[in-house]
Amino acid sequence: MIDGDGFRPNVGIVICNSHGQVFWAKRYGQHSWQFPQGGIDDGETPEQAMYRELYEEVGLTKNDVRILASSRHWLRYKLPKRLVRWDSKPVCIGQKQKWFLLRLECDESKVNMQRDRSPEFDGWRWVSYWYPVRQVVSFKRDVYRRALKEFAAIAMPFKERKFKRKGKKG
């Protein structure tokens, strides 16, 4: 399902632990890392899609997490032209994402990335809250920054909330 502007509806998932760290997943067979995310199926709400993707990609269920927040708006990113499939109809030029902030409520040993026949990820780790903004593939950075900024007051201890841009004082 692609909207009239060429964006595929999608959910993004930020899972945090009690230390203010976030779940950072390694893409299967690649050297790139990202937050879990996935498309919204026809007839599915963003929350339903989030729980489905959470189970498919990470092996966690609704009982393993608690929703702390969801983004107020859809956050969009465009794909680099080299990744757009121009021969598909309709053409998808990017993703529009509803983001969810979840807190892990179970033991992390429940994480299982091998539930699906074609797993999205083959590794994961806890990282500092702002780490993903600098490490994710460049075309997703602004969306990650915006989502994490919106969730910072909920996810992080007060002293660590401010995102410092590299090379700037303050």
Swiss-Prot record:
EC number: 3.6.1.-
Domain Nudix hydrolase per the UniProt entry, residue ranges: 6-149
Needed co-factor(s): a divalent metal cation
Enzyme class: hydrolase
Disulfide bonds: none
Pfam families assigned to the protein according to its UniProt record, in alphabetical order: NUDIX
InterPro entries in UniProt: Nudix_hydrolase, NUDIX_hydrolase-like_dom_sf, NUDIX_hydrolase_CS, NUDIX_hydrolase_dom, RppH
Motif (Nudix box): 38-59
UniProt GO BP: mRNA catabolic process
Keywords for this protein: Hydrolase
Annotated family: Belongs to the Nudix hydrolase family. RppH subfamily.
Protein name (database record): RNA pyrophosphohydrolase
